[in-house]
Amino acid sequence: MEFIPTQTFYNRRYQPRPWTPRPTIQVIRPRPRPQRQAGQLAQLISAVNKLTMRAVPQQKPRRNRKNKKQKQKQQAPQNNTNQKKQPPKKKPAQKKKKPGRRERMCMKIENDCIFEVKHEGKVTGYACLVGDKVMKPAHVKGTIDNADLAKLAFKRSSKYDLECAQIPVHMKSDASKFTHEKPEGYYNWHHGAVQYSGGRFTIPTGAGKPGDSGRPIFDNKGRVVAIVLGGANEGARTALSVVTWNKDIVTKITPEGAEEWSLAIPVMCLLANTTFPCSQPPCIPCCYEKEPEETLRMLEDNVMRPGYYQLLQASLTCSPHRQRRSTKDNFNVYKATRPYLAHCPDCGEGHSCHSPVALERIRNEATDGTLKIQVSLQIGIGTDDSHDWTKLRYMDNHIPADAGRAGLFVRTSAPCTITGTMGHFILARCPKGETLTVGFTDSRKISHSCTHPFHHDPPVIGREKFHSRPQHGKELPCSTYVQSNAATAEEIEVHMPPDTPDRTLLSQQSGNVKITVNGRTVRYKCNCGGSNEGLITTDKVINNCKVDQCHAAVTNHKKWQYNSPLVPRNAELGDRKGKIHIPFPLANVTCMVPKARNPTVTYGKNQVIMLLYPDHPTLLSYRSMGEEPNYQEEWVTHKKEVVLTVPTEGLEVTWGNNEPYKYWPQLSANGTAHGHPHEIILYYYELYPTMTVVVVSVASFILLSMVGMAVGMCMCARRRCITPYELTPGATVPFLLSLICCIRTAKAATYQEAAVYLWNEQQPLFWLQALIPLAALIVLCNCLRLLPCCCKTLAFLAVMSIGAHTVSAYEHVTVIPNTVGVPYKTLVNRPGYSPMVLEMELLSVTLEPTLSLDYITCEYKTVIPSPYVKCCGTAECKDKNLPDYSCKVFTGVYPFMWGGAYCFCDAENTQLSEAHVEKSESCKTEFASAYRAHTASASAKLRVLYQGNNITVTAYANGDHAVTVKDAKFIVGPMSSAWTPFDNKIVVYKGDVYNMDYPPFGAGRPGQFGDIQSRTPESKDVYANTQLVLQRPAAGTVHVPYSQAPSGFKYWLKERGASLQHTAPFGCQIATNPVRAMNCAVGNMPISIDIPDAAFTRVVDAPSLTDMSCEVPACTHSSDFGGVAIIKYAVSKKGKCAVHSMTNAVTIREAEIEVEGNSQLQISFSTALASAEFRVQVCSTQVHCAAECHPPKDHIVNYPASHTTLGVQDISATAMSWVQKITGGVGLVVAVAALILIVVLCVSFSRH
């Protein structure tokens, strides 16, 4: 692009420095001639000086003199010491002190419209005055460093990450203008040039940094084109995340991996009412190894602060120096935790126990079938808190012990494959089963295991139930637990373990009790006549007491333990807790799935016969692409042959994970519409059996009725003639009457007797008498055929020749069917100009509804903290604002001196159980969104053949939005049908959309869709209704039993059925991001076209065709351009002519041809008519074409028809000819019989 001189901003001229990285040709204005001559004179003087002053050394450029002086000044310190100083080394980095042209230009503008945003005295970003608004990135914390702007009320938009407010009136003159014009090229910002290409802004890597958020990007006229929010490092260049404008509509461009460029604000933590940066604890250094208990207390005090994990990392790293990170650092947090013993319902021998490998949680959200199991032991860590892949540590009688990881096993109905381990977590792929067992073998070769009831049925990915990943196939989206040990967003709660009872610490010594601590901290209590309790770290003797009267427990507050519902919490510390990250996060990935063998397909009349060969259970589904989809599906497990009927609108069949197959029927038939009557009847019977039977039956009935009527009239006339002679004795019948009525002239013998006589005596006369009436009838029929037609031809179907719209001006309106992939031609006839043909084809049509998100729902997680056991007293519940929170106190649970409850008193012991619901960790990837769908907006991608060029444009089909094709303006829509496949309520799950009447927000029902609701996957507002009821724990067991409805989300996933992608009518293709329906073949699409005068060719300039004739040598109807027509012509001059069919039942492939001399042209056409008669217009001349089309041989094709599909087939000319002959012959017989009857009646009446 061309740069405008910078005098626009400075009101003065100066020579800009060339921009070397971009080889853009700049338009340099010529200077006045005197300046050019002065420059040449200066060059000449310089050259003479160089030649004459040889003794003087050549001078270096001025900018290097300073460097030379600096080097001379630095020689002294460099000679005094051998160590190189750092300031000279940093000089090259600070070399660019003078800003370049672009930087100076931006600084001049920024002085007025840019303001710093400060937080605690530090600049975190910038605010910009643009138009009538002051704009600041929403992620930039702090206030604007301006008294007037700081007190404004900003409106926040999280979608665009922007805050806006109205500019005070007295500051509007300082604001910059903005523009949506962004031609590709280079723009300017504070750090130099910004390249805009492919819809993205990029800069050289290193030119921007955190703290630049909010800086504007200017064009060369000083207008703001975008505001910087952040950047994504892409190697040599950095892609900018910006907010920009597109035709007054704000848009946000965010490249993948973009980070916000606000200056980081140090997160503060608290210690003894003193705040400090979380990454720098005040104890120098605050090391867990040195002060473990105090460090954990500090972490518990700051567990809810944003910088908790920074404090945790700093507290566990003793060295103040920066260390190289490794995979071992991810295990570093486990040195502050320990394994534990917990209750297990089945320890492998049919009874419960306190197991070192107790199962806490089994997660199966991954769609690839991987299980994530949480246990009480820790894997990958030794008892010395070091990282070791080959070991695991478990609690052996309250003391951590090591075991080999090789002895770890997981099984359901068969052994599982362990794919990953770290800390408390195991990843495994397991076969189907109803129970899950985890166990290990310790160093003493003793096996420990724990079994839980768990129904495991690996989900199906795709549409085939396969057992192992194929080598080749198809990639489908799925989710899995990533085998990464790095810190994730998922976390678990830990807390201080309770005191652990240990009777081995007590021993009886001659009436006294000795407590041996063995280097540990022990809490004791003895009831020996009085209360005797305390906390000791050395051995102690209790006088006059017995072991049964004392209780001793080991106290260890130097390590955390998982907050398990199977272990009581520490009574002294209450709700104090910590958090640690856990490995193996759930993530969306792609999985390789097999593709079923292609079926063997045989085509029949309006049907497809598919022979299927499934290697494993494979899903077959199909739907009609008409208004009623009639979706059907079935799982095929063995070789099977299926016969599917193909409707007129088409059939879509999906077999396994293959792409859908689409079929359309053709009007194929065994007979022909141009043969004998029986062939014609067979032809129409195969096409329209019901109507053909009805028509043939009615016609047969009418013909038979007419024949019967003629026979009846003849019999009536004969009787009228015979009666007078029969009543007269000896009467003789006239010869003519006896000949017509087939009676004897005399009454001596009957007709039968005469016939027998002639047969016996004169057989030639018998045959002559029999042939005379037949010969007379044939002669009369042939004579009447030469007469004018007695009856008009009965047209069974009238095909209207509508043609194209004719306009008197350059504005043209047409309506095309909303069918993708079928070209449509329209003819523009303008008086005085040669006709113009426009060809249009819909490449895609999109219906995008306006959505408003009600909530998202996902699988819930039941959080059960460790139960609180109140020894010798009663606990009380407190109200907590948590989703579906429940709290109960149970009395009479634990007996006197029961060790599991850690109580030692003879009074009542109580347990406080509490539970609540929160979103599962999988909700970030596995969730369904409930939307309300409103009016859908339609857009069409249109291919237009205009003036010999194919041009593709995209327009909103609203009847208002105009797009330009060269010099013509097209306005598309509005569509004739406001139909949309989406209901008022829809649910979106990954790439699928479902019409569903979901419950509103805050009204979810247990066990159904929406039992847990949240506004967004990240929001903290959660509503839950899971029917959570706490139950009374069994005596002698530490646990929190409860009853709860199953997850409504998981139930919905199993029962949701087919999505709209498979069940939508009219062949709609449903897509998401955004939600839209594409290529729905419903309704029509009106198009208004404004064509300028220059696009037309005057009649005098266009070729004129004469002597045109049309011949159709071959035609196959209902086939894709199966007809060929040859048009002969004579033309006055060479040129191009538009070709168009004036009948909408015939579609011509060619739109424009070149004519020259006396020649002929060949065109291809498509029609659904058996007898096609149409007119073809070439330039301004029309010619009549007639074709006798035969049915296609192919029953089924994989493309839609390119012509207008008729609801009922036409009657061929041959069929109409046979109808005329048959009806004419029968009508003649009736007419002759009627004439005879009339004559006989007249004669009869005249006698009387």
From Swiss-Prot:
Region annotation Interaction with the capsid protein: where it falls in the sequence: 716-720
Organism expressing this protein natively: Chikungunya virus (strain S27-African prototype) (CHIKV)
InterPro entries: Alpha_E1_glycop (IPR002548), Alpha_E2_glycop (IPR000936), Alpha_E3_glycop (IPR002533), Alphavir_E2_A (IPR042304), Alphavir_E2_B (IPR042305), Alphavir_E2_C (IPR042306), Flavivir/Alphavir_Ig-like_sf (IPR000336), Glycoprot_cen/dimer_sf (IPR036253)
Descriptive protein name: Structural polyprotein
Chain residue ranges for the region called Functions as an uncleaved signal peptide for the precursor of protein E3/E2: 262-274
Site (Cleavage): W261, S262, R325, S326, A748, A749, A809, Y810
SS bond partners: C113-C128, C269-C278, C283-C287, C286-C318, C344-C450, C347-C353, C416-C430, C478-C591, C526-C550, C528-C545, C721-C742, C858-C923, C871-C903, C872-C905, C877-C887, C1068-C1080, C1110-C1185, C1115-C1189, C1137-C1179
All ranges on the Cytoplasmic side of the membrane: 714-748, 785-795, 1246-1248
Site annotation Involved in dimerization of the capsid protein: residues: Y187, N220
Effect of substituting M53A: Complete loss of nuclear expot of the capsid protein
